[in-house]
Amino acid sequence: MNSPQRLSTYWVTCADGLETLLQQELQGLGIEQTERFAGRLIFQGSLEQAYRVCMWSRLASRVLKPIHTFELERTHDARDVAEELYEGALSFDWSLIFAPQSTFAIRLHVEREIKVNSQFATLRVKDGVVDSFMEAVGRRPSIDTKQPEITLFVLAGKTEHTYCLDLSGDSLHKRGYRHYMTDAPIKENLAAAILQKAKLTELKPDLILDPMCGSGTFIIESLMIFTDRAPGLVRRFGFNGWHGHDRELWLELKAEAAERHEIALQNTLPKFYAFDADWEAVKATRQNIIAAGFEKLLDQIQIEERTLADWPSFENTYNTAFVVTNPPYGERLGDKASNRALYLGLSALLQQYFPKQHAAVIAAQIEQADVLAFSEPETLRLMNGKLPIYIRLGQVKPVANSQPFLANWHADPVEIEGAQDFANRLQKNMSALKKWAVKDQVFCLRLYDADLPDFNVAVDLYGDRLHVQEYAPPKTIDPEKAKKRFNLALAAIRAVTGLPREAIFIKTRARQEGKNQYTKQSTASKRFIVQEGQAKILVNLTDYLDTGLFLDHRQIRLRIAQEARGKHFLNLFSYTSTASLHAALGGAASTTSVDLSNTYINWSKENFVLNGLTVDHADEQHMFFASDCFEWLKEGHEQYDLIFIDPPTFSNSKKFYGTFDIQRDHVSLLKRAMNRLSAEGTLYFSNNYRGFELDEEIDAIFYAQEITNDTIGPDFKRNQKIHRAWKIQHPHMN
């Protein structure tokens, strides 16, 4: 292999955006000088160097050897490009390149400015090659578009057409191991490029994780890198039928590559983890790993069906970790909001399990990548086929503050003229709630609820932000006086909590009836994540009077989380389905959420996706219905072990059949729901109507136990009428 060889020109093509990385890779293969173009590098080199690129390049798409250039005499608009391509092919003696008994295929690439029917032009190139053979040797080769022995790559340009021998045959991204496919896969060479951009070999991780592994491409490409496995070692190439092929040289290069791989297999490898929520993807990953020749390494690769909500603890399992994944964006997941929730949830998991470790995540839109909590992030834009993708790489930021806001709050003296009583009461409430909030890790709670008649507001804490609701004053109160008092309250709130103005969101709340209870307040959507128990929940303090999380039902949701394991759970009037979310995270066998509003059903799905749970999935474990709850109960027959009903006081929605009044209609609602409750099941019923009384008929036919006191948290003890709640079971249970 050390004998001098004649230098030739070679083109190495790649996906747009990979030129710099490919240039670095070629330098590592001993090719120092390259000319760079969009999607292509050109070098002058030996056949051995071209073979090495075929064997070792993890990033290239094709290796082309220009054979013939046909210069054009005319370039005006009326040119017949297809005929030019025919003439160019005919003008060269192709019998010098391959034998007539060989099969061949044509790949045509036309520069953007040129207008021509590509299919017809490809046929004319084929005609030119065939006619050239007939003139030269009196025989013609056959076409084989599936597995040709020779592939000719033709570039149709403005001033010339270039005819190349494609040494690659098939595109180099086809390593030969992907026998099983999943939706929206990443090409093998793009996966390798991401690993190279992440400087995987320099990181030297002892743990590599792909939590949404699809067909296992990242895991397999990582294995190939760490075992020094040449990507071209076991695949077919396009030079075997070429007259200029040096078979002895190629076999020497193959032997060298095989030896390097065998030596590297003796090295200590990282531990590999491949998870996916789809069992078909798990099977595909396992089969593709075997097809890639790594069956003996399966004991070092943990391949499991897992959702993001079901990650194992990685504590004390690594010193340096690397996480890389291609989430199911776009085609596999659906709407943009759910996509954003998926990336938010993934980011939170990375912060929880892999702080300060490196990660690389693919996104379909840059907005998805922007929610990832990486320090000093890098972004790589590539083309995966015809789809642009963004790769965000960086070091995972640690969680800024994992403790409730009250844990670090202190009751410092404040003076607010005109609102001192209010400031004192707010401070007293916060001091009283602090111990409980820290002990039970409560991040969202009510701090004040019209405790003083002159300050008729509710103050709710969501993480490190405040939601302040001003109850509409009676008509007898001077509006200017009410406005002044409210502004004093805001000043006191800021002084007591220490939170800046931008962390305080203000609403005016009147008694809500019917459709007005969900009136949108503004056009800007500013959802953010809060924690409740195991659940991460999206709340919105700007767009609606309600935030997406009813704080007074916290204790019921946590009770459901404790009781849901292995049970089938039904949530009627589910709103944003936070109770369903708690049930799912608590191990429910299934959850079903029903609400009339498409808006809240979509919000519900985002909450599930945020927590790594699958929605709209083949196994239908978590189902959502935008439907009238009465009609839905009437139409189905499925039985549930645990049911939660938290209906509105009143509704006259256009989607509703008539009107709904909780006092008038609760008997028929509960009867229908109890028909869907399993024999040993439990139904929790709650509502916020202050004058509500449970009808005696319910007590007569079911076992109904009022549990209101058990469902009101310490932050609502000052308002015992915030809601009423019952535990209802079939009579034989007691």
UniProtKB/Swiss-Prot annotation:
Name the Pfam families for this protein: Methyltrans_SAM (PF10672), RlmL_1st (PF22020), THUMP (PF02926), UPF0020 (PF01170)
Which reaction equations make up its catalytic activity?
Answer: guanosine(2445) in 23S rRNA + S-adenosyl-L-methionine = N(2)-methylguanosine(2445) in 23S rRNA + S-adenosyl-L-homocysteine + H(+); guanosine(2069) in 23S rRNA + S-adenosyl-L-methionine = N(2)-methylguanosine(2069) in 23S rRNA + S-adenosyl-L-homocysteine + H(+)
Q: Which GO terms describe its molecular function?
A: 23S rRNA (guanine(2445)-N(2))-methyltransferase activity; RNA binding; rRNA (guanine-N7-)-methyltransferase activity
Q: Which domain of life is it from?
A: Bacteria
Q: Which CDD domains match?
A: AdoMet_MTases, THUMP_AdoMetMT
Q: Which Gene3D superfamilies match?
A: 3.30.2130.30, RNA methyltransferase domain (HRMD) like, Vaccinia Virus protein VP39
Protein name (record):
Ribosomal RNA large subunit methyltransferase K/L
Organism of this sequence = Acinetobacter baylyi (strain ATCC 33305 / BD413 / ADP1)
